């Protein structure tokens, strides 16, 4: 476990004896601060601007550059409205520190680790700095293993790697939030793990909706907050670029505590990883750096690497990260998504077409990919079943134009059989979710990987050709499908 430098308290009174400087220039969210000779703060140190006399001002900044002549350039994490030249600035002597541990569950924090949910202060004395080194190679768990989610379409066709990084692609209204909440629920029940959600530069309304839905579905337990399964960290669209650039690190730091100290499996959600890059680009321009390709910051790869390399499995536990990826103008060659792809182990693509058919989760079985789907990692049986499922669905996709023009009757006997099995597979890839029980009335189902493979093997073998396709819709394992078929006949 890594040891961290001492922390600073949130009260200015506790840092009265620290170095003091004063503001000499303000350009938007960027401040230049002069310090006495020989008392310069380090890069990434947190500075606190103290209001004059009775003014209650508490603006936190982070040192980004040492300019010479005893001056530093810092980026503000809060609005800089009301700041003036000459105001006193206190060097805390340490990077931004945030609360960590079980008391963070069920709470909402900002980039500085301050609770913003009006539920009072966080009951913890344990804090970590947000700038931490990635685990040393000797600490890493290099064994590749599957992270079972209990969601059939994910586990069979695009399995997640334990301690891996998954890109989540999908537009509005296709079920991203429900899928995220189901994963949070399943990791808590099946793996005894917890989750941290980092809202990076997205809409405040979306953050509020997610919080309300989590309370409604039981992921956040209002009556007993300590039984909640997730901690939320928000740095929304309206906040300064410094806050949006660092909020991902705040969420990651909270996740690292659960992995390194509590030795748990953790799910870390980042929504949206593109906004992290976008905020870095804004800060880079404000600091006067020469832009690189398409106007992005020259340090793009370094910034992305410093975040992504901390997301990994160690011998203590794992952080498995699911990152929503916005692709600007649908251009996959744009430097921001292209840099992100280099770090991903799997992609989960949500399809509007499947959502329109009522097949949930609307994960596209042909577009979703995973580097884990190899015979030596998942076994021959799993690999063969997944490939046959994809081949059947691909053939069905190719035949759809012919069916639309000529109808099913014009197909050969073999193709008709393929279509019938593909439609059953498509429906069997749907699944009732625990977090959707309150909306659908159907009890949620966690389906183990072994049960999933058996179910699809039976459909592909033709043993279930006599069952109606609606028997496979929104069920858990294959036994439930056969029971549903019996009920449909009676």
UniProtKB/Swiss-Prot annotation:
Enzyme Commission designation: 7.1.2.2
Pfam family, one: ATP-synt_VA_C
Chief location bin: plastid
Subunit structure: F-type ATPases have 2 components, CF(1) - the catalytic core - and CF(0) - the membrane proton channel. CF(1) has five subunits: alpha(3), beta(3), gamma(1), delta(1), epsilon(1). CF(0) has four main subunits: a(1), b(1), b'(1) and c(9-12).
Cellular compartments annotated: Plastid thylakoid membrane
Name by which UniProt lists this protein: ATP synthase subunit beta, plastid
InterPro entries: AAA+_ATPase, ATP-synt_VA_C, ATP_synth_F1_bsu, ATPase_a/bsu_AS, ATPase_alpha/beta_chains, ATPase_F1/V1/A1_a/bsu_N, ATPase_F1/V1/A1_a/bsu_N_sf, ATPase_F1/V1/A1_a/bsu_nucl-bd
Organism: Cuscuta reflexa
Annotated residues for binding of ATP: 170-177
GO MF, one annotated term: ATP hydrolysis activity
Cellular component terms (Gene Ontology): chloroplast thylakoid membrane; mitochondrion; proton-transporting ATP synthase complex
SUPFAM superfamilies listed in its UniProt record: C-terminal domain of alpha and beta subunits of F1 ATP synthase, N-terminal domain of alpha and beta subunits of F1 ATP synthase, P-loop containing nucleoside triphosphate hydrolases
Membrane topology: Peripheral membrane protein
Class in the EC hierarchy, top level: translocase
């Amino acid at each position: 476990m890594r040891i961290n430098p001492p922390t600073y308290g949130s009260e200015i009174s506790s840092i009265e004896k620290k170095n003091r400087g004063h503001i000499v220039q303000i350009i938007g969210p960027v401040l230049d601060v002069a310090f006495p000779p020989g008392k310069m703060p380090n890069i990434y140190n947190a500075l606190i601007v103290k209001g004059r006399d009775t003014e209650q001002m508490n603006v936190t900044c982070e040192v980004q550059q040492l300019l010479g002549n005893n001056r530093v350039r810092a980026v503000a994490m809060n609005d800089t409205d009301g700041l003036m030249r000459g105001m006193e600035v206190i060097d805390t002597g340490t990077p931004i520190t945030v609360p960590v541990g079980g008391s963070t569950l069920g709470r909402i924090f900002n980039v500085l680790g301050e609770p913003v949910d009006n539920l009072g202060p966080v009951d913890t004395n344990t804090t970590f700095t947000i700038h931490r080194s990635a685990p040393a190679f000797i600490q890493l768990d290099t064994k590749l293993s599957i992270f079972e989610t209990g969601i059939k379409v994910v586990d069979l066709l695009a399995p997640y790697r334990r301690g891996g990084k998954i890109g989540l692609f999908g537009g509005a209204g296709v079920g991203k939030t429900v899928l995220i909440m189901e994963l949070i629920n399943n990791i808590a029940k099946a793996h005894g793990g917890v989750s941290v959600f980092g809202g990076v530069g997205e809409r405040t309304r979306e953050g509020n909706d997610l919080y309300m839905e989590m309370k409604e579905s039981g992921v956040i337990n209002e009556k007993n907050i300590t039984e909640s399964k997730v901690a939320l960290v928000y740095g929304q669209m309206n906040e300064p670029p410094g806050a949006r650039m660092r909020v991902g690190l705040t969420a990651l730091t909270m996740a690292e505590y659960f992995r390194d100290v509590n030795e748990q499996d953790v799910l870390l959600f980042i929504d949206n990883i593109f906004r992290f890059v976008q905020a870095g680009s804004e800060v880079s321009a404000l600091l006067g750096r020469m832009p690189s390709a398409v106007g992005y910051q020259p340090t793009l790869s370094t910034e992305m690497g410093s975040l992504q390399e901390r997301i990994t499995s160690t011998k203590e536990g794992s952080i498995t990260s699911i990152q929503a990826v916005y692709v600007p103008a649908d251009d996959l060659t744009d430097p921001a998504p292209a840099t992100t792809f280099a770090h991903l182990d799997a992609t989960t693509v949500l399809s509007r077409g499947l959502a329109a058919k009522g097949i949930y989760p609307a994960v596209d079985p042909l577009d979703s990919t995973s580097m884990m789907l190899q015979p030596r990692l998942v076994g021959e049986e799993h690999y063969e079943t997944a490939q046959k499922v994809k081949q059947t669905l691909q053939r069905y996709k190719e035949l759809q134009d012919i069916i639309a023009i000529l109808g099913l009757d014009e197909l050969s006997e073999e193709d008709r059989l393929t279509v019938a099995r593909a439609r059953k597979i498509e429906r069997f890839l749907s699944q009732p979710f625990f977090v959707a029980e309150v909306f659908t009335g159907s009890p949620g189902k966690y389906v183990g990987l072994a049960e999933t493979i058996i179910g699809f093997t039976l459909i592909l073998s033709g043993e279930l050709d006599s069952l109606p396709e609606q028997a496979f819709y929104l069920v858990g394992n294959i036994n439930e499908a056969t029971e549903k078929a019996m009920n449909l006949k009676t």
